[in-house]
C-alpha cells in the first residue's frame, strides 16, 4: 500500500490518500486538544496508544457484527482504513451524567441514566459542535432518516458491547461519541476512532477519571491513565 499526499489534518489525526481509491491511512499524532481546539499540547506516546487502542476496540466491534472503517495496523502510529463519505454528525450515548449534559441540565455528575440517552451534535468546531435533533439532520441534508436510524441502531449496539467490555475491566463507560460515514457500496460504517479521547471512562470503585477529562480539567497523568485503561483491557502496546 503506497502512502500518498495528506488529504486532511484534524486536531489529533492526519488522513492520507493511498494508491487504492477506497482506502486511506490514518496517522495518530501526539497532539492533544480541548475546548474545540483552543488548547493544544503535545503528549508523548499518545498517538501510539490511541492508534493501538482504536485498533483493539474496532476489532472487538467487528467481531460483534458492527461494520467499522478499520482494516489493519500499519505501525505504531498508523492504520489502514476504508474511505468513507463522512456524515457531519456526532452520535453521543450517555450512561451517566457528565460533561455538557451536566452543564445544560444542571444535574449531578455521575447520575446513572436509566435508560441511557442518545444525542446528536453537528460536527462544526467554529460553531462549537451545537446540539441538534434528527429533524435538523434531515432538513439540512446532513443525512437521511434511514441513515440516522442505522446510526442510532449501531450506536446502541456499540454501547452494549463496550459497556460489558469496560465493566469486565473494572471501568464505567460514562459516555462516548461516534462518527459514521457511507462506504462506496452505500452502507453505513463506523468511522473515525474510539479511544479515551472520545469517551469518558471512570474506575468503578474510585470513580477516578481515566480519559481526556484529565487533560481538560488539568488533572495530570493523562497518558498514564490511557495506558492503564489499555492494560486493563489487554491492548498490546
UniProtKB/Swiss-Prot annotation:
UniProt entry keywords in alphabetical sequence: ATP-binding, Ligase, Nucleotide-binding, Purine biosynthesis
Chemical reaction(s) catalysed: 5-amino-1-(5-phospho-D-ribosyl)imidazole-4-carboxylate + L-aspartate + ATP = (2S)-2-[5-amino-1-(5-phospho-beta-D-ribosyl)imidazole-4-carboxamido]succinate + ADP + phosphate + 2 H(+)
InterPro entries: SAICAR_synt/ADE2_N, SAICAR_synt_PurC, SAICAR_synth, SAICAR_synthetase, SAICAR_synthetase_CS
UniProt keyword annotation of Membrane present: no
GO cellular component terms attached to this protein's record: cytosol
Molecular function per GO: ATP binding; phosphoribosylaminoimidazolesuccinocarboxamide synthase activity
Annotated organism of origin: Pseudomonas fluorescens (strain SBW25)
An individual GO BP term: 'de novo' IMP biosynthetic process
Protein EC: 6.3.2.6
PROSITE patterns assigned: SAICAR_SYNTHETASE_1, SAICAR_SYNTHETASE_2
Protein name: Phosphoribosylaminoimidazole-succinocarboxamide synthase
Pathway the protein contributes to: Purine metabolism; IMP biosynthesis via de novo pathway; 5-amino-1-(5-phospho-D-ribosyl)imidazole-4-carboxamide from 5-amino-1-(5-phospho-D-ribosyl)imidazole-4-carboxylate: step 1/2
Database matches in Pfam families: SAICAR_synt
Family membership: Belongs to the SAICAR synthetase family.
Keyword field contains Nucleotide-binding: yes
GN (gene name): purC
HAMAP family (UniProt xref): SAICAR_synth
Amino acid at each position: 500500500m503506497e502512502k500518498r499526499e495528506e488529504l486532511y489534518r484534524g486536531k489529533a489525526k492526519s488522513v492520507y490518500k493511498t494508491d487504492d481509491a477506497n482506502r486511506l491511512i490514518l496517522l495518530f499524532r501526539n497532539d492533544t486538544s480541548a475546548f474545540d481546539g483552543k488548547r493544544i499540547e503535545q503528549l508523548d506516546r499518545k498517538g501510539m496508544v490511541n492508534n493501538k487502542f482504536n485498533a483493539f476496540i474496532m476489532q472487538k466491534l467487528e467481531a460483534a457484527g458492527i461494520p467499522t472503517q478499520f482494516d489493519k495496523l500499519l505501525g505504531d502510529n498508523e492504520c489502514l482504513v476504508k474511505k468513507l463519505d463522512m456524515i457531519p454528525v456526532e452520535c453521543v450515548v450517555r450512561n451517566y451524567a457528565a460533561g455538557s449534559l451536566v452543564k445544560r441540565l444542571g444535574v449531578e455528575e455521575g447520575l446513572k441514566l436509566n435508560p441511557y440517552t442518545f444525542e446528536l451534535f453537528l460536527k462544526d468546531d467554529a460553531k462549537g459542535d451545537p446540539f441538534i435533533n434528527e429533524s435538523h439532520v434531515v432538513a439540512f441534508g446532513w443525512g437521511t432518516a434511514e441513515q440516522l436510524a442505522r446510526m442510532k441502531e449501531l450506536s446502541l449496539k456499540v454501547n452494549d458491547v463496550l459497556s460489558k467490555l469496560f465493566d469486565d475491566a473494572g471501568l464505567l463507560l460514562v459516555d462516548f461519541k461516534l462518527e459514521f460515514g457511507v462506504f462506496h457500496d452505500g452502507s453505513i460504517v463506523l468511522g473515525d476512532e474510539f479511544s479515551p479521547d472520545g469517551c469518558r471512562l471512570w474506575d468503578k470503585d474510585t470513580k477516578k477519571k481515566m480519559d481526556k477529562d484529565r487533560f481538560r480539567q488539568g488533572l495530570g497523568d493523562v497518558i498514564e491513565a490511557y495506558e492503564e485503561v489499555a492494560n486493563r483491557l489487554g491492548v498490546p502496546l
